[in-house]
Swiss-Prot record:
The chain crosses the membrane at residues 98-118, 146-166, 170-190, 201-221, 246-266, 284-304, 328-348, 360-380, 395-415, 422-442, 461-481, 489-509. GO terms for cellular component: plasma membrane. It comes from the Bacteria. One of its GO terms (biological process) is peptidoglycan biosynthetic process. Pathway: Cell wall biogenesis; peptidoglycan biosynthesis. It is a multi-pass membrane protein. InterPro entries: Lipid_II_flippase_MurJ/MviN, MurJ. This is Probable lipid II flippase MurJ. Its main location: membrane. It comes from Bdellovibrio bacteriovorus (strain ATCC 15356 / DSM 50701 / NCIMB 9529 / HD100).
């Protein structure tokens, strides 16, 4: 094996290993988050869960925007370039200090404005029908004021995560949000009489959790001697380069995430519970999405940025192709499983306390539609770093604008026919357009991905998925034998059979992803 081929193999392993570390940390956090959501559905009625979900949308938007968006994709390439040009790390530290100082000023002003003007902000993003319920409206405003401080902490966390990712640390930043979920769980179970208003604890749990996850990464950066410090000189050439790349990316990612606000606005005009149904289905969608696509995309960006800086086009292309195929290989069975087992999954997880059978049916209907979008959104999440790594943030921005325009235009039309489900279908159409355009324009703006390389493995994935679908029918057979009392066991056995069927068939069909997953999980 040549030195170049050996190097490429190590680079691929590095990306997959980084993604595996991120996925491991994310899995821990998501499991805790799932317990939190189960408690939320069982302990609080739909008026409180709607209020909390609506109030959390804004700070959560900033979490997604900065934590999975423009801050990392614009900062990491410039940070890595300064490191390569100055091995001492002094320029990289100066960049981190200057940008951090600028970020703190921006976040301080943003948080203060959000707290002061929370009412007009929520009148903008929620329909007028929502405010007709005075008690729910006041609770939403109260929670919004408490949780807006989370924006400051979560954006600080996202910046710290970007530095650690650039330094090759992926596991701890992915694990840190577990502290957020632990905090929210603790506050969810606190006695209601401890708070002035029923539901306040949900908001305080978010705020304290945001502080804890930022502090954890601050300790990690201090140990590496990269903890940013305040400085007077803010507008350095490197900061200018980050901001130039950040603005289009901020708009592009903002437009993609803005679809959640579009859903919130339209859903707030629908019957009570609609906002909560979207939230619970979205949480189940985010589990495979964050474990697979976000982890791969975040791990891919530093590696591709390095290849782009060194002009290694072939390495760039082959690593991108392998990462895209790995995403398809894992997202495809997740989408199939969520679609076919939507209702039993919701029943096992949530059907208790104040979560009713009607809640199960409505949430499951949304989850099935989200399962279709999982493949599309996951592909987009892996394709976008291919643009960002060559410092092109404008194309994803324009494409996000196109898909958002489609969603906003189509949603009211489909809602008249199918209500809440029509709103979700509109989002799927928009996601399809975004993914197709990202793939179609890729070769023009980066080394790209060769379709000929994708077709044969993708066909194998489809065949393995077909076998998995057959194995999923075991759920109905098991339920006929065991009854509702052992539903959780029946669901667990069915999922286990499906996993064995998919990966077993993939192995028989010769899917290389099996061996790559095994190697990446080794220390």
């Amino acid at each position: 094996m040549s030195h170049e081929a050996s190097g490429l193999k190590e680079d691929r392993k590095k990306v997959l290993k980084s993604a595996f570390l991120m996925a491991s940390g994310t899995l821990t956090s998501r499991i805790l988050g799932l317990f939190r959501d189960i408690a939320l559905g069982a302990l609080f009625d739909r008026a409180v869960t709607d209020a909390w979900t609506a109030a959390f949308r804004i700070p959560n938007l900033f979490r997604r925007l900065f934590g999975e968006g423009s801050l990392a994709v614009s900062f990491i390439p410039v940070f890595m370039q300064t490191q390569s040009e100055d091995p001492t790390g002094d320029r990289a530290r100066n960049l981190a200090n200057a940008f951090y100082s600028l970020l703190l000023v921006f976040l301080g002003v943003l948080t203060l404005l959000g707290i002061v003007y929370v009412e007009p902000l929520f009148r903008l993003i929620l329909s007028s029908d929502y405010a007709l319920d005075a008690a729910k409206w006041e609770l939403t405003l109260r929670m919004g004021r408490i949780m807006f401080g989370f924006v400051f902490f979560v954006c600080t966390y996202a910046f710290y995560m970007g530095i650690l990712n650039a330094l090759g640390s992926f596991g701890l930043p992915a694990l840190a949000p577990a502290l957020l979920n632990v905090s929210m769980l603790v506050f969810t179970f606190m006695p209601p009489q401890w708070f002035a208003v029923h539901g306040d604890g949900l908001a305080w749990g978010v705020l304290i959790g945001g502080l804890l996850q930022a502090l954890l990464l601050a300790v990690a950066l201090k140990q590496r001697n990269y903890l940013p410090r305040l400085q007077k000189t803010l507008w350095t050439p490197e900061v200018k380069a980050v901001v130039r790349g950040m603005l289009p990316g901020l708009i592009g990612m903002g437009l993609l995430q803005f679809s959640t606000l579009v859903n919130l606005y339209f859903a707030s005009s629908l019957p009570e519970g609609s906002i909560s149904y979207i939230y619970w289905a979205d949480r189940l969608l985010e589990l495979p999405l964050s474990l697979i696509s976000v982890s791969i995309g975040a791990a891919l960006l530093p590696t591709l940025s390095d290849f782009a800086n060194r002009g290694l086009k072939e390495k760039f292309q082959e690593t991108a192709e392998e990462s895209f195929l790995m995403n398809l290989f894992l997202a495809w069975p997740a989408a199939l499983g969520l679609y076919i087992l939507a209702e039993p999954i919701i029943e096992v997880l949530f059907l208790r306390g104040k979560f009713t059978v009607q809640d199960v049916q409505m949430t499951a209907a949304i989850l099935r539609i989200y399962a279709v979008s999982l493949l599309l959104v996951s592909c987009s999440r892996v394709l976008m770093p291919l643009y960002y790594s060559v410092k092109n943030t404008k194309v994803p921005m324009v494409l996000a604008l196109v898909s958002l325009a489609v969603h906003v235009s189509l949603a009211p039309v489909l809602m008249r026919q199918w209500g809440l489900e029509g709103l979700m279908i509109s989002g799927v159409v928009a996601a399809l357009i975004n993914a197709v355009l990202l793939m179609g324009l890729l070769k023009k703006y980066s080394p790209g991905i060769r379709m000929s390389v994708l077709l044969r493995p993708a066909l194998k994935f489809v065949l393995a998925g077909a076998g998995m679908v057959i194995s999923l029918q075991a759920y109905e057979l098991l339920m006929a034998q065991t009854g509702r009392g052992l539903q959780m066991l029946a669901l667990f056995v069915t999922i286990l059979l499906a996993v064995v069927a998919y990966f077993g068939l993939a192995y028989v069909l010769g899917c290389e992803q099996i061996s790559r997953i095994r190697r990446s999980s080794q220390p």
